[in-house]
Amino acid sequence: MTGHNTHWKLWKFIKVLLFSVIFSIIALLLVATVRTFTLDVGSGLHLGKWENTTTISLQLRTQQRQNLLANFKAAIRIPTVSFTETHVNTSALQEFDGLLRSVFPKVFSSSLVRHEVVGNYSHLFTIAGTDADLEPYMLLAHIDVVPANEADGWDAPPFSAQEINGFIYGRGTIDNKQSVMGILQALEYLLEKGYTPRRTFYIGLGHDEEVNGLHGAVNIVKLLKSRGVKLLYVLDEGLAVLDGVISGLDGPAALIGISEKGQTTVKLSVSTSPGHSSMPPRESSIGILASAVRRLEENPMPRLFGYGPERSTFEHLAHKFGLPLRFIMSNLWLFSPLLSRVLERKPDTNAFVRTTTAVTMFNSGVKINIIPSYAEAYVNFRIHSAQTLQEVLELVQSTISDDRVKIEMVNGFDPLPISSHDEQSFGFQIIKKTVLGMFPQLTVAPGICVGNTDSRHYRDITQDIYRFAPSWFKPGDPQRFHGVNERISIQNYEEIVQFYFQLMQNNDIMNLPPPHSSQHEL
């Protein structure tokens, strides 16, 4: 009888346990399902509740279209290449200075605009507003470009600005002369129409962004700091409009960068005794270093998906995916581990999951029959927002775990702070309003820049740095960035001018609408 009672109690316990598990699973699925069909993180804006400041419209005439296109092409034809921090094309930068002065006469002659050359080749414009109580903002772009070689397979010479099927080809068309010329062209049109801003703003054009901005952006910031300038927000290049680039996403999306990954380059070196190849030692400097590099590649940095801005990106986009992706992305609190394992399979999405490891240089040896005494390698890490530079260096040390390998940091910096992007974030909401006002079909989401810009130098004078330009990228276009056949459509360049024209006026809004004004109506 006792045995029977014991079995009965055990069976009762198992039934209760099974019921609890089943109930928990059903509850989880119910919560996840409800969240899937209700999560829609600020997909649009209710424009009726916004203060209306736009009084000037831009209807481009045929002659204006021809002129703005000619101005842009002239900018592309000037090879403002930055090779290294100490080697830039100074004659091209001087020529570019002359171009700006000739094609934007209102900008350089208006009493509202103060122009200063900084660091010999960079430009700072101060556009005076009528209300000194409004905190100023700043628009950034950069004049310099990376090198380009026609022999790499360009369809047109990289500094020809040649038109092919409605596109302008050339280095700088999407990085970043479309913003340089677009910003100044928009300001030129506004000044021609008698525009006076309510809110003071600045325009900063760096000349060495591609080589860290140490003479351009750094000196612009020093000048502004010396004057006690504090900025409401900064808008620089970074992310773009992605149309068909994100697999499974219904419609195009505008991603506004709210942070950048950190970065460090580490030098690994091994020194041993040299020798002749006829009497090789058990281990060589090359072999020891190769083993260290292999350990770094075979043991990637930990998965951190969901602990940085990428979570907000996926949640903002979730409602534009079909099932089952919508179900998964709407419930990252439940599915982050699963999704991270899927994303890490491809290099372009693995960058969202972790700090990436890239072996970029490996040098050793002077002759085929001499065993070298020295070998060195350089490894670049792009640091996830949830990690620090110090944590990465410690993981490198523990992963290699070989005292014979000397580890030195060449350079590095932590991930950039995450800029605000909620309903009361002035900069983010103004940019979003401008994007949706022009392209109501877009979904706008915050994003993370896996590359770096010189906007990081502005951290001391603003809390919010955003990285976006309305360049449209279709499948294959992201590879043109710093690559072969960089190009922009004529229509898209006109849209960029329109975007900045509208953005400057939208920034004259004094206050954002009350919270919870976001609707799904735009």
From Swiss-Prot:
Catalytically driven reaction(s): an N-acyl-L-amino acid + H2O = an L-alpha-amino acid + a carboxylate; an N-acyl-aromatic L-alpha-amino acid + H2O = an aromatic L-alpha-amino acid + a carboxylate; N-(5Z,8Z,11Z,14Z)-eicosatetraenoyl-glycine + H2O = (5Z,8Z,11Z,14Z)-eicosatetraenoate + glycine; N-hexadecanoyl-L-phenylalanine + H2O = hexadecanoate + L-phenylalanine
Example of a GO MF term: hydrolase activity, acting on carbon-nitrogen (but not peptide) bonds, in linear amides
GO biological process, one term: lipid metabolic process
This enzyme's EC code(s): 3.5.1.114, 3.5.1.14
Subcellular location: Secreted
UniProt entry tagged with the keyword RNA-binding: no
One GO CC term on file: extracellular space
Cofactor: how and how many bound: Binds 2 Zn(2+) ions per subunit.
Binding site for Zn(2+) 2: 142, 175, 236
Glycosylated position list: 52, 89, 120
Binding of Zn(2+) 1, residues: 175, 210, 482
Broad enzyme group: hydrolase
Pathway stated in the Swiss-Prot or TrEMBL entry: Amino-acid metabolism; Energy metabolism; electron transfer; Lipid metabolism; fatty acid metabolism
Primary subcellular site in the record, as a coarse category: secreted
Record keywords, A-Z: Glycoprotein, Hydrolase, Lyase, Metal-binding, Protease, Secreted, Signal, Zinc
Pfam families named in the record: M20_dimer, Peptidase_M20
Active site: residue positions: 144, 209 (proton acceptor)
Activity regulation (UniProt): Lipoproteins are powerful coactivators of PM20D1 activity in vitro and NAA biosynthesis in vivo.
Signal peptide positions (record): 1-35
Required co-factors: Zn(2+)
Family: Belongs to the peptidase M20A family.
Role according to the record: Secreted enzyme that regulates the endogenous N-fatty acyl amino acid (NAAs) tissue and circulating levels by functioning as a bidirectional NAA synthase/hydrolase. It condenses free fatty acids and free amino acids to generate NAAs and bidirectionally catalyzes the reverse hydrolysis reaction. Some of these NAAs stimulate oxidative metabolism via mitochondrial uncoupling, increasing energy expenditure in a UPC1-independent manner. Thereby, this secreted protein may indirectly regulate whole body energy expenditure.
This protein's name: N-fatty-acyl-amino acid synthase/hydrolase PM20D1.2
Protein's gene: pm20d1.2
